[in-house]
Amino acid sequence: MSFTGEYHHNLDAKGRLIIPAKFREGLGNEFTVTRSLGGCLAMYSAEEWEALEDKLDALPFTNSKARDLKRFLLGSACTCELDKQGRILIPQTLREKADLKKDIVLLGVGNNIEIWDADKYFEKYHDFEDEEQLEQDWENLGV
């Protein structure tokens, strides 16, 4: 399943976050949350996480960059389950790593879902409205 769309929710005082129904369908009841690039967290379905783990396992142990990548992704990963209200509990360590406060943006980006602190997300990506820059970026990427 490909995840798309942007949703805004609040993190409650216990660190629980409502997962939009559209995302729950593709995630299933059990999935993985880990750190991601850019200062956000990423959620992967069990199937997508297994595929990512297979790629990481295939990396050469003797390569220090490969070991660093494994530490970054696997060392912070946790398995999460939805509660009866469609929420997950994001561990304190992950909330701190992503600087999550109350207002959260969930962003479907293909094979995973990014979890952003809303202020950080809007500060970092407020310039997505610059069409000339987007056109140039798309062309450079071959899109």
Regions found by a protein language model. Name each.
Residues 1-9, 13, 23-80, 84, ...:
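Flexible "stalk/tail and boundary" regions
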